[in-house]
Amino acid sequence: STAGKVIKCKAAITWEIKKPFSIEEIEVAPPKAHEVRIKILATGICRSDDHVTAGLLTMPLPMILGHEAAGVVESTGEGVTSLKPGDKVIPLFVPQCGECMPCLKSNGNLCIRNDLGSPSGLMADGTSRFTCKGKDIHHFIGTSTFTEYTVVHETAVARIDAAAPLEKVCLIGCGFSTGYGAAVKDAKVEPGSTCAVFGLGGVGLSTIMGCKAAGASRIIGIDINKDKFAKAKELGATECINPLDCKKPIQEVLSEMTGGGVDYSFEVIGRIDTMTAALACCQDNYGTSVIVGVPPASEKITFNPMMLFTGRTWKGSVFGGWKSKESVPKLVADYMEKKINLDGLITHTLPFDKINEGFELLRTGKSIRSVLTF
C-alpha cells in the first residue's frame, strides 16, 4: 500500500557535529530505478558513526547516520530483479556491482560504487531520498540506517535467510564482518601464530574471534579499559594488557613478551599513534600489521621506513575483505548454524528513541555493541 508513495517516518538526524541526535519526522521518497526501499528493524551503533558526530570524519550535513542494520524490503524501483518486497536484507556500505575492477579481482572488495573516500552523501543520480522540514538530508555511505525507512542501491543490499533474527545478524552489516574478516581473510592468520589486537570494542573482539577461528595459539588484547578484558578472554584472547600499566612503550612490551614481535597485529581503534605501535610490535622480517580502525580524516602518519624495509607488511582492511553481496548471506548462514558468535558482542538492546543513550554507553566504554530496535 505504500509502494510508489512518499513515506513519513521517524529518523535520527545529525544536524551539526558535537550535538545529540535529533529524532524528527522525515519524508522518504520512493526508490528510483535500481533502488530498494527498506524498512529498518534493527541497527547497531558503531564507532564510525560516532567519529562523524565528533567531527573526526568529515561528512556533508545534515545527515542520517547508521550503517550496520537489517530490515525488510518495502518496495523496489524499476529494473530491480534480485529482490522483492518482504525479503529480509542487510544494507551494505561496501556495495558489490560485479562489474568494476575490485569486484572482478578475486582479492578485491572495495567496489567503486562506494561512497567512502570522498563522500557525496547522495544517491547515484546526485539527489537525496530524504527530506525534513523542506530540507534535503544527506545519506551516509550509501546506507543511512538510523531511520525507520531508507533507500539504497540494489548493489548495496544482500538478501538473507528469512529465519534470521535481525536484532542479531545486523552486526554482520559492519562490526562483526569487519573484524572477523580482517583476521581470516585479509591477514590470513596462520595456525599456531601469535596475534595482537589493539582496541577491544565490537570490531576488536570480532578480530579476536577471527584469530581464534584461524588457529592462532596466542592472542593478546590491548586496551586502556580493563573492564573489557573479561569479555575479550571469553571470546578468545589468551591474555590482555593495559598500556597505561606498562613502564615501556607497548610495542617494546609486546616484542619482549613474544621473543621478537608478533606474527600479526591489528589496529582496531583509528588512532595514528596506535597504528605505528601496531606496526612496530610485529616481527621485523615477516610480521603483518593490519589497519582496521577508521583513520582520522585530517591526520598524516610518520614512521621510519626501515620498519618496512626489513620485511614487515602493513596493510588496510575494509569490511574484512569480504565481497559484500555474496559473502553476507553466507556469514548469516554461519550464524544460523552456530559457527560464529554474535550474541556475545551485544551488551545492550534499546528502543530506537534511546539512540543518544546508546551513544553515551559507547563513549563511556560501558557497551560493546548496542542494538537499536524499531
From Swiss-Prot:
<keyword id="KW-0007">Acetylation</keyword>
<dbReference type="GO" id="GO:0005829">
    <property type="term" value="C:cytosol"/>
</dbReference>
<dbReference type="InterPro" id="IPR036291">
    <property type="entry name" value="NAD(P)-bd_dom_sf"/>
</dbReference>
<protein>
    <recommendedName>
        <fullName>Alcohol dehydrogenase 1</fullName>
        <ecNumber>1.1.1.1</ecNumber>
    </recommendedName>
</protein>
<keyword id="KW-0862">Zinc</keyword>
<keyword id="KW-0560">Oxidoreductase</keyword>
<dbReference type="GO" id="GO:0042572">
    <property type="term" value="P:retinol metabolic process"/>
</dbReference>
<dbReference type="Pfam" id="PF00107">
    <property type="entry name" value="ADH_zinc_N"/>
</dbReference>
<dbReference type="GO" id="GO:0042573">
    <property type="term" value="P:retinoic acid metabolic process"/>
</dbReference>
<comment type="similarity">
    <text>Belongs to the zinc-containing alcohol dehydrogenase family. Class-I subfamily.</text>
</comment>
<feature type="binding site">
    <location>
        <position position="46"/>
    </location>
    <ligand>
        <name>Zn(2+) 1</name>
    </ligand>
</feature>
<dbReference type="GO" id="GO:0008270">
    <property type="term" value="F:zinc ion binding"/>
</dbReference>
<feature type="binding site">
    <location>
        <position position="100"/>
    </location>
    <ligand>
        <name>Zn(2+) 2</name>
    </ligand>
</feature>
<dbReference type="InterPro" id="IPR011032">
    <property type="entry name" value="GroES-like_sf"/>
</dbReference>
<feature type="binding site">
    <location>
        <position position="97"/>
    </location>
    <ligand>
        <name>Zn(2+) 2</name>
    </ligand>
</feature>
<dbReference type="InterPro" id="IPR020843">
    <property type="entry name" value="PKS_ER"/>
</dbReference>
<dbReference type="Pfam" id="PF08240">
    <property type="entry name" value="ADH_N"/>
</dbReference>
<feature type="binding site">
    <location>
        <position position="369"/>
    </location>
    <ligand>
        <name>NAD(+)</name>
    </ligand>
</feature>
<dbReference type="GO" id="GO:0004745">
    <property type="term" value="F:all-trans-retinol dehydrogenase (NAD+) activity"/>
</dbReference>
<feature type="binding site">
    <location>
        <position position="103"/>
    </location>
    <ligand>
        <name>Zn(2+) 2</name>
    </ligand>
</feature>
<keyword id="KW-0520">NAD</keyword>
<feature type="binding site">
    <location>
        <position position="67"/>
    </location>
    <ligand>
        <name>Zn(2+) 1</name>
    </ligand>
</feature>
<feature type="binding site">
    <location>
        <position position="111"/>
    </location>
    <ligand>
        <name>Zn(2+) 2</name>
    </ligand>
</feature>
<dbReference type="InterPro" id="IPR013149">
    <property type="entry name" value="ADH-like_C"/>
</dbReference>
<keyword id="KW-0479">Metal-binding</keyword>
<keyword id="KW-0963">Cytoplasm</keyword>
<feature type="binding site">
    <location>
        <begin position="292"/>
        <end position="294"/>
    </location>
    <ligand>
        <name>NAD(+)</name>
    </ligand>
</feature>
<dbReference type="InterPro" id="IPR002328">
    <property type="entry name" value="ADH_Zn_CS"/>
</dbReference>
<feature type="binding site">
    <location>
        <position position="174"/>
    </location>
    <ligand>
        <name>Zn(2+) 1</name>
    </ligand>
</feature>
<feature type="binding site">
    <location>
        <position position="228"/>
    </location>
    <ligand>
        <name>NAD(+)</name>
    </ligand>
</feature>
<feature type="binding site">
    <location>
        <position position="223"/>
    </location>
    <ligand>
        <name>NAD(+)</name>
    </ligand>
</feature>
<dbReference type="InterPro" id="IPR013154">
    <property type="entry name" value="ADH-like_N"/>
</dbReference>
<feature type="modified residue" description="N-acetylserine">
    <location>
        <position position="1"/>
    </location>
</feature>
<feature type="binding site">
    <location>
        <begin position="199"/>
        <end position="204"/>
    </location>
    <ligand>
        <name>NAD(+)</name>
    </ligand>
</feature>
